[in-house]
Structure formats: C-alpha cells, structure tokens
Regions:
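Short, low-complexity N-terminal intrinsically disordered segments enriched in polar/charged residues
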Residues: 2, 16-53, 69
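A mature extracytoplasmic/lumenal domain signature
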Residues: 51, 61, 92, 105-106, ...
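Bacterial N-terminal signal peptides
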Residues: 7-16
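Structural motif
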Residues: 51, 96, 126-127
Length: 142
C-alpha cells in the first residue's frame, strides 16, 4: 500500500522538476536580453560583454571586425552617430550542444528613422556555461 503513494509522489516530483527545466533556446535568449538592455542604454562595453573574446562582427557594407575591443569601438561609434534603440524578434533558434544559431528580424532607431532588417548570430556556450555571440552578421531590408 505504501509503495503506490510513494511512487506517485516520486513521479510528481520528477515531472514538476522537468516542467521547470529551461528550454535549449533559453540560454541564448537570456544572453540576447542582456545585449538588448545594454544596446538600449547605449552601453557599448555592455554590448561587447555579450560577445566572445575572439568574436566576429560582420556589419553590412563594412569590413569584418574581430574581438571585443573592436566590437565595443564599433558600437560606441554607432551610438555616437545616433543609433539609439533596437527591437529584436527571434525567427528561429537552433541549438546543438554548446552551439546555437539564431535568425532574427530587427528594427533599429537611427536618429529619427526606423531601420528594419534581419540577422544571423552564432552563439557558443563557454566553459563558464555562459552563452556569448561568436559571430554576428546583419543587413537592412532596404
């Protein structure tokens, strides 16, 4: 008699623990939230912290940049030029082990303009279990 209630209790605890487990996409989504927060505060150093030390930034119409210092300088220049806000909508996130690929659409505010576009990011989870951007490429819809 005691066995059945104990089995049900264990099953309930196991299932409730599974319900609280984050999805595979949650790590990159949480890191992207940090990116958006820093971006919308025009915090170039905060944006750069979401990237791996050897990350690649591939802005449309510009040379490829490598490393967090170059990425920080790029975003500081963009903020100084009038970039002020970003909204991102994930279209698809595919996760395999410690790598993830995210395709998103975005709208960036530049001075008084709204610029829509799309991007692809490669995320990598480090030994510290933090997801960081390894590669970021984008272009506008116009």
């Amino acid at each position: 008699m005691l066995r059945r209630p104990l089995s049900l209790a264990l099953l309930t605890l196991t299932l409730s623990g599974c319900a609280n487990m984050p999805s595979a996409e949650q790590g990159p989504q949480d890191a992207m939230a940090q990116f958006r927060t820093a971006f919308n505060k025009q915090d170039a150093a905060g944006v750069a912290r979401v990237f791996k030390d050897d990350a690649k930034l591939l802005p449309a119409g510009k040379p490829m940049l490598t490393g967090t210092e170059a990425i920080r300088a790029y975003w500081q220049g963009a903020f100084n030029a009038g970039v002020s806000h970003i909204e991102k909508t994930p279209v698809e996130i595919a996760v395999s082990g410690d790598l993830a690929v995210e395709t998103s659409s975005y709208v960036v505010t530049f001075k008084d303009q709204q610029i829509a576009g799309k991007d692809t990011l490669v995320w990598q989870r480090g030994q510290d279990k933090q997801w960081r951007i390894a590669s970021d490429i984008w272009n506008s819809d116009k």
